[in-house]
Structures are given as structure tokens and as C-alpha cells.
Amino acid sequence: MSSSSSSSPGDWITGSYTGNSAGVRITIATFLSVALYNVIELIVLIFFTFKRYQGSYFWSMLISSTGILPYSVGYLIKFFDLTSATWVPLTLLTVGWWTMVTGESFVLYSRLHLVLQNQRVLCLVKGMIIINIIILHVPTTVLTYTANFSNSPTSISGYNAMEKVQLTGFCIQEAIISGLYLWEINRILRLTADGASRNTILQLLVVNLACIFMDIALMIIEFMNFYIYETTLKATLYSIKLKLEIAVLGKLVDTAQRNVRKPPMFNAAAGQYPSFVDITNIGSDMNHAAPMRTDQYAASLEGIRFDVR
């Protein structure tokens, strides 16, 4: 694999890292090793959290988590020049990038189903994700292979520009989905009288804001042209965001279960429901948000293991 001639972590868009900085090499290895460790833990957590392995929430979580594996291995091979076959790391990191990034968006979309009942908004969100696959994933992939195989200044400049565009686009996409979720959670917070439920919702707000700040940090690093740091840190941050998703799921289930066990707090005639979340969607099809029905809560909770490890 070809390499650049300077030692700045902002270079090495093509080829391996051939600089003399031990710090950069340690940083690369650390970020990607943490990501790989988190992948193993995530897969175990997913299979122990979900009792029924179905629904878009389960599959998007599993696919996005698994995607971190080829993404991280691809960049390890690329930056440490572990093979002369350029296509091997490029293919691994590209497949991993597609599944990791868009998989995370589908995770957020699936979770949005738990609190948002507006079908028109949900369809628009799904359409946005699909459109961004076409306008962001496809051209970036083409430029990735073109830049690394041709190594021409024009193709490298094109890839460098597209890298910033796609990162910004996907960060905006995740911010929009998280924003809709935060909006609904905030509305629910004002309507929730139960103190424990309010505390849970506040924790969900903090988790979502933390994920947004992670995306902002990635964008700052990218626009500072620290390519090596941005691409390797991305794997770590996405693994952390997915682990936070597991925590969010646990909070949602705990709150729903607690409210189900409080019949005195429930008054269907007055329009009061035992939970702020349509928990039926967790263990079933997430493509269609069902109207909130109180008689479904107890049965639907069987679809989740409450002893998340």
C-alpha cells in the first residue's frame, strides 16, 4: 500500500501510516482495540437483552454492532500495512462503515417508534435514511477505491472533501432523529407525575445529548484534518453509543415494567396510560408503530430480558 511523505495524522488518507510517531501508532491501536472489545461485549449484551431475536430494533442493533468489527480490522490492516492487497482493508472498512453508520441510524429510528406515533414523521425519517444511503454512502465508496488505487491528487482531494460531507450529513441525520426523540421525551416528561419515571426520562435525555456531543467531537476532529484520529475514534465512539443504547433499552423496559405493576396509577377512561413507551414494538415488528394499548404491556414485556448483563 502506498504512503504519504509527511508525518501528520491529517495525512495518510491513502496507504498505510509510515510516520515515526509512536504516539500516533499507540493511539490507532488503542482506539481500535477498545472498539473491538466493545463489539464482543455488545453482541453478548444484545443476545442476553432480547429474549426474542426479531424486530428491527434487535436486527439494527446487531448489524450495527457487528459492523464495527470489519471497520476496525480494516483500518488496523490499512494503517499498519499488514497486507499488500489494497482491496482487502478497503473492502473490510467500507462494509463495516456502511453497516455501522446506517445501522446506528436505524437503531435510533427503531427506538423513535417507542415514543412517536406520527406515521408521517416516521415515514419521512425512514426516507431520509434511505436517501442518505444513496447520496452519501455510494459516492464516498467510489471515491475511497478511486483515491486508494489511483493515488492521484485529484481523487484524493475529492475523497477528502466527500469525507467531510458524508460525516456532516450522517451527524445531521442522527441529530434529527435524536432531536425528535428528545422532543417527545420532553413532552412526556411534562405529563409524567411519577418521580421514578421522571428520573428515568431525564437520564434518557442525558444519554441522547451525550451521543450528539460525540458526533460534534468527530466533526471537529475531521475538519481539523486529523484523518487518522477521526477514522479510528469513530469506531470507539459508535461502540460507546451502541452500549448506551443498551442502557436506554434497559431504562425503557424498567420504567414500563414498573408502571405496569401500578394499577392504581392507571385510568384508561381518563386517557392515562401506564407507560410513556409503546413497549410492544421492542419484541415485534418495528416498521409500524401501534397505537398505545394498555392490555398489551404485560404480554409485550415478555419479549425482553430484564436481567441485562
Positions of the model-derived regions?
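Alpha-helical recognition domains of nuclear gene-regulatory proteins
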Residues: 46, 108-111, 115, 185-188, ...
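Alpha-helical transmembrane segments of polytopic integral membrane proteins
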Residues: 40-43, 105-109, 178-182, 245, ...
